């Protein structure tokens, strides 16, 4: 029987929540509506992986830039972090995976969720690293959702194989959306029109983004995540694939993401 999500640090009656496992954000909201999607009834996605929330994908994303790394999406989300908690609600987790030190800082306030990731190369040779927040953003209806702020960036939809660059500034969340975006700007917004709001995702040091939703045009939803496709859109930010970073020995890669909500 799964013990995930394990030890939790909570505030505001559980509407703000971080798990020690993966130093993974599970909940945050600024008003009466949740901003993060987390399936507490089916918390174990697979062995040692929490379903939903904001999984931390590091020191590689997917199977790495050369498609030769396992497990998928790195070791961070499968690792129990050493965590300290401060007030106001601030969680700092540290871990060591594959000679890469990981420090993840989470700060929650009434107006924003802020995260900062630092990856340190403890190896004696340069390392290619990736880091992404695989953020599950809660929406009223993903079929009506759009992501704004993509104009000029390049894209590759790994569900369809299509690729190109954005002329328009918005991406609709259609079936078969698994779109890696490179050269994206520092300000994205998820338009959650059914709930009359937009969720801002502002970043530093994050040239990559991924927009993903499990709705498929051809296959049946056969797991709890796919069955809940209408309830979330993943807007993932960080550095991955073509923007993987070579980190010198004893050097760092640092990036940050800030999430906030505004009425449409």
What is the predicted role of each segment?
Residues 1-51, 186-206, 249-264:
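Beta-strand-rich N-terminal accessory domains
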Residues 17, 82, 90-92, 103-105, ...:
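Beta-strand secondary-structure signal
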Residues 45-46, 103-106, 242-247:
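Beta-strand-rich interaction surfaces with strong enrichment in secreted/lumenal proteins
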Residues 46-49, 57, 192-234:
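Glycine-rich active-site loops that engage anionic ligands at enzyme catalytic sites
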Residues 69-110:
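Extended, loop-rich substrate-binding clefts of extracytoplasmic carbohydrate-active enzymes
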Residues 95-135, 139:
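Acidic, contiguous internal or C-terminal segments within carbohydrate-active enzymes
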Residues 126-128, 136-209:
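Active-site/ligand-binding surface loops and adjacent short beta/alpha elements
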Residues 215-264:
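C-terminal appended segment following the main domain
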């Amino acid at each position: 029987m799964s013990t995930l999500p394990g030890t939790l640090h909570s505030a505001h009656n559980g509407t703000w929540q971080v798990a020690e496992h993966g130093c993974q954000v599970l909940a945050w909201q600024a008003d009466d509506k949740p901003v993060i999607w987390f399936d507490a009834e089916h918390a174990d996605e697979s062995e040692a992986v929490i379903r939903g929330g904001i999984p931390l994908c590091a020191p590689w994303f997917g199977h790495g830039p050369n498609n030769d790394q396992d497990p998928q999406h790195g070791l961070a989300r499968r690792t129990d972090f050493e965590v300290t908690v401060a007030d106001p609600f601030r969680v700092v987790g540290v871990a060591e995976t594959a000679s890469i030190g990981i420090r993840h800082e989470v700060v929650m306030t009434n107006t924003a969720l802020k995260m900062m990731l630092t990856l340190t190369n403890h190896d004696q040779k340069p390392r290619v690293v990736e880091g992404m927040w695989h953020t599950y953003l809660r929406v009223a209806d993903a079929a009506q959702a759009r992501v704004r702020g993509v104009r000029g960036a390049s894209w590759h939809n790994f569900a369809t194989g299509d690729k190109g660059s954005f002329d328009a500034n918005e991406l609709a969340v259609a079936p078969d959306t698994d779109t890696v975006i490179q050269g994206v700007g520092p300000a994205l917004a998820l338009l959650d029109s059914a709930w009359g709001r937009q969720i801002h995702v502002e970043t530093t040091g994050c040239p990559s983004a991924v927009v993903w939703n499990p709705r498929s045009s051809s296959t049946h939803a056969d797991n709890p995540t796919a069955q809940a496709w209408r309830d979330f859109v993943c807007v993932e930010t960080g550095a991955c694939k073509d923007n993987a970073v070579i980190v010198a020995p004893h050097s760092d890669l640092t990036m940050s993401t800030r999430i906030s909500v505004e009425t449409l």
